[in-house]
Structure formats: C-alpha cells, structure tokens
Curated annotation (Swiss-Prot):
Mediates the transport of CDP-ribitol. Does not exhibit CMP-sialic acid, UDP-galactose and UDP-N-acetylglucosamine transport activity. One of its GO terms (cellular component) is Golgi membrane. Its main location: Golgi. Belongs to the nucleotide-sugar transporter family. SLC35A subfamily. It catalyses: CDP-L-ribitol(in) + CDP(out) = CDP-L-ribitol(out) + CDP(in). It comes from Mus musculus. The lineage of its organism: Eukaryota, Metazoa, Chordata, Craniata, Vertebrata. This is Probable UDP-sugar transporter protein SLC35A4.
Length: 324
C-alpha cells in the first residue's frame, strides 16, 4: 500500500521501520529550524547574510550527495546516465529559489502574523496541483484531513505562543508600545497567491521528475543541488554590499546550515518514495516540535490555541492515514 493510499511504503518490517524513522527525523529537524535560527540572533537580528547561509546549505547538500555517490558507486546501474536527465532539475531549482525569495519580499506587504496564517493556503494549492498534475484523487476523508491541517496551521500562527511576562520594572519596548497592525496590501495578496502556487508546483514537479527517472536518488540530488548552488551563488553575488561570506556565523548558525542540509536530503527521499502530501504532513507535524523547542530554548509560553492546533494535526493524520 502506498503513502497516497494511506499506508507506509515497503512490505518488510525493517523497511517500514526505516521509513518511520526517516519521517520522525525529518519532522524533528524541520521543527528545529526556527528555534535554532532564533538563537543566532544578535541584538534582535540575524548577524550574517541570509544568502550566504542558503548558499552554504546548498553546498553542504551537494558535498553530501557527492560523498554518497562515491561510497555507493558499486551499486550504480550499468552505463553512464545521459546528462540531459539533469536538465529538468534546473526548473526545480529555479522554483525553489523563487519560492525562498518570495518569502522575503512578502514581509514588505503584510505583517508577519498575516503571512503566517495565510501562507497555510499552500497546503490547498499543493493538494490541488498534486491531483491535477499527478492524476491522484483524494477521497472526501483525505480532503477533510488537509482542511484540518490548514486550520491547524492558521491556529498555531495566530496565537500558539505568548511572550513571557516581564515582571521587572522598566520602559515598554518599542514593539510592545507600537505593535504592528494586521494588514495586507493588494500587491501582497497577489504575491501570496503566487507564493502558494509556486510552493505547491515546486513540490509536485520535483516529485514528478524524481519518480519518472530510473536513477539513484543521490544522483538526482546531485543534479538538483548543482543547479541550486549555481542559482544561489548568483543571488549571493548580486545581493549587494553586506557582511562577508562567513561573517557573523556562530555555532548555532553552523547547526542551522547542517540541519537544513540534512533535512533537505531526507525530504528528497520523501519526495522520491512518498509524496508531496506526505511532505505537507511532515511540515504540519513539525509545528509541535517547533513549539516544544521554542518553549524550552526561548522560554516562550504555550497557549491553549497551540494545544488546539496539535489536536487538529492529530485528527488530520488519523483521517488521512487511518483505516476508513
């Protein structure tokens, strides 16, 4: 039974165990990204260039793929694969690059809370493109599960945390005295719709080409991350003056890069052997990991809305993957 049908790929128990471990690891690493990034902040801001961190992440992925290919060269299929099979991954890298940059530009046209809530529409766009492009049909039960995921993400973004109460006397912070009002401009709404469509398209398109090609996953990743390095090097070179390439990097920043690189490789395995829908569940379930780490590392306080979001995620998983 396949992931799309609600099962776990693989017939043998060891393979099921490895797949389950991969899903748990990917969920944990995805959820750890934001808290680890917050620990990098100095005086309320990231001290290094985001473009250099992204480029380092892509380089790390590329090196890990190359090492994997060298170690397992004896298991390669006979014959040299035609390099034209690398071409489709250029579009995949371009879509991911556009998606990552849109996230930055969106912040100019709406407040962070509005972005966090409305960006959950990418769950719906991914599901729609998954059905249209890959020819899969979702049952009413599975459709309801995805709606619950969207609701859970919106709940979590709208009030899953609150700042710890400051009992010490002192002047109120500027952010507290003048909170940013909820707002979104017409251009921001258009960009948000574009972001959700590109997010869904990048996921579904990558799944499509990975499953169509009979090539080792490590080789496909090598193609993808080679284009990713080229694209992000161009973005870094064109980003204008700023801190040096490694300026501002700390131990936490290195951990962020390694975490993102390894999780990217795990997510590619999900796309190859699972589905874009599985990826959506990983991202949604990672909210729980994010919340726990934020509470432990950043002393943020969980609210009742967080537990509502966690309940909705649990219901969605049971509906989608449980027996009818």
């Amino acid at each position: 039974m396949s992931v799309e049908d609600g099962g776990v790929p693989g017939l043998a128990r060891p393979r099921q165990a490895r797949w389950t471990l991969l899903l748990f690891l990917s969920t944990a690493m995805y959820g750890a990204h934001a808290p680890f990034l917050a620990l990098c902040h100095v005086d309320g801001r990231v001290p290094f260039r985001p473009s250099s961190a992204v480029l380092l992440t892509e380089l790390t992925k590329l090196l890990l793929c190359a090492f994997s290919l060298l170690v397992g060269w004896q298991t390669w299929p006979q014959g040299t694969p035609p390099w034209r099979q690398a071409v489709p991954f250029a579009l995949s890298a371009l879509l991911y690059g556009a998606n990552n940059n849109l996230v930055i530009y969106l912040q100019r046209y709406m407040d962070p809370s509005t972005y966090q809530v409305l960006s959950n529409l990418k769950i719906g766009s991914t599901a729609l493109l998954y059905c249209l492009c890959l020819g899969h049909r979702l049952s009413a039960r599975q459709g309801l599960a995805l709606l619950l995921l969207m609701a859970a993400g919106a709940c979590y973004a709208s009030g899953g945390f609150q700042e710890p109460v400051n009992t010490l006397p002192g002047p109120a912070s500027a952010a507290g005295a003048h909170p940013m009002p909820l707002h979104i401009t017409p251009l921001g709404l258009l960009l948000l719709i574009l972001y959700c469509l590109i997010s869904g398209l990048s996921s579904v398109y990558t799944e499509l080409i990975m499953k169509r090609q009979r090539l080792p996953l490590a080789l496909q990743n090598l193609f993808l991350y080679t284009f990713g390095v080229i694209l992000n090097f161009g973005l870094y070179a064109g980003s204008g003056p700023g801190p040096g390439f490694l300026e501002g990097f700390s131990g936490w920043a290195v951990l962020v890069v390694l975490n993102q690189a390894v999780n990217g490789l795990l997510m590619s395995a999900v796309m190859k052997h699972g589905s874009s829908i599985t990826r959506l569940f990983i991202v949604s379930c990672s909210l729980v990991v994010n919340a726990v780490l934020s509470a432990v590392l950043l002393q943020l306080q969980l609210t009742a809305i967080f537990f509502l979001a966690a309940l909705l995620i649990g219901l969605a998983v049971c509906l989608y993957y449980g027996s009818p």
